[in-house]
C-alpha cells in the first residue's frame, strides 16, 4: 500500500488546491502533468507507452504468450473541480502496483498486461467517459457542437475516431475504484465486487412562471417559477425514496431568469 500511496501523492501534486482538494480538468496542464508522471513510472516498469488524441496514456507489457488476449487494468486521471485524491487516480496507481508486484516476485503472466490512464471521465464539454469511449468507438463525433468543442482542445473529430482500438484481443478489463457511496463503509467491509454500475439519465426541466412585483403582488396572484421548481424537486425526491435503493435522484443546478429583483426577510 505504501507504493500506491506514494504514486497517489505523486499524481496529487498536480492540480492540488489550497483547501487540499484536487482539480485536474480534461486536457488541462495539470492533467498532462499527472499523465507524464504516470508515463514515467510505466517506462520504469518496462512498459511500452503510447498516447492518443483523446488524451489517454497507455502502457503495454508483454506476457509469455503474445497470441493471448490482453488483460487491461486502469482508471481515469482527471477529476471533478475540487475533487478527492483517490477518485480515478487510485485505480491507475493500483494498476501500476500490480505490475510492480508481478515483477518483484518474478511472476510472468501468460497474457499481455495493459494499463490505461483515461482522460475526461468526469463531466466536461465533450462528454463524460470520453477517453474510454474513444478507444471503444463510442464517441458520436457527429453530435451537434462536438466538432467545435474538440477543436478547442486542439484536435479534430477524425483524430478521435482514430483512437478506437481492436477489442477482440482484450480478455477482460479490471478497475480498482474507491467506493463513492456508503454501503461498504456502513457495513464495515473493506472491498466489494461491482456487479452493475450506475446508468445516468439527465433532464433539463423548465418551470415557466409569471414575472410581477416581488413586494406587492398578493400571494394568491403569484405564479413563481421557483416555487413550482421547488415542488418538482421535492416530489422527485419523494418518489425515488418510495421505490428502492437502486434509484437515486439529484438536482445539481438551478438557474432563475430574469432573477433581477429579490426580497430579503
Predicted features along the sequence, with ranges:
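N-terminal capping segment at the start of a domain
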Residues: 1-28
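Active-site metal-coordination/substrate-binding segment of hydrolases
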Residues: 39-43, 48, 58-151, 168
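Midchain, well-structured core segments that form catalytic/ion-binding scaffolds
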Residues: 120-129, 133-265
